[in-house]
């Protein structure tokens, strides 16, 4: 934890910090500008080790769907943040494939722990009486991210060109099928989250 915190990452452990490192600025430039900033491969590896040894409890992400033109102009002009939510699960599944994280740890850190940390009622688990928020993943589907599969209104992702070995096939929110075959069913909406106080 000391190495992680000494590098200025504090208590924020987002998916992009587990995936990208400073060499990626050469090709992606301002597209991966975020706060805290993407650090070195040593920092990324320290985060991955902290994740695998359970020093990190929660994996989170933000989704900042800035237009591509807002990400131009170099480090001083490009806005911070990137659209990450669509490909965040498959990016973390790569860590499972590489043996850095177990599938059980992934579920704990991405589902159970966030619900517990924020005291969210009836979420984060598959249990009677809980909302059926589920993702069906094909763990053995190799594919490459292309621009035409981006669902975010901003129309781009820093993941374009990346090869993944798992794919999200379906997503259910409150038991309703909301995503299948790279299409979102807009007729279903989420519900207001309730928090235990």
Please annotate each region the language model reported:
Residues 1, 17-19, 66-68:
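Active-site environment of divalent metal-dependent phosphoester hydrolases
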Residues 2-13:
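Single conserved hydrophobic/aromatic residue that forms the stacking wall/gate
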Residues 11-14, 59-61:
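Hydrophobic faces of well-ordered beta-strands that scaffold small-molecule active sites
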Residues 14-21, 119:
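Phosphate-binding core of ATP-grasp and ATP-grasp-like enzymes
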Residues 25-56:
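A conserved active-site cap/scaffold subdomain adjacent to cofactor or substrate pockets
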Residues 31, 52-59, 64-140:
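His/Asp/Glu-enriched, well-ordered alpha-helical/loop segment
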Residues 32-42, 79-83, 157-163:
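A short acidic, glycine-rich active-site loop
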Residues 74, 131-194:
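C-terminal cap of metal-dependent C-N hydrolases
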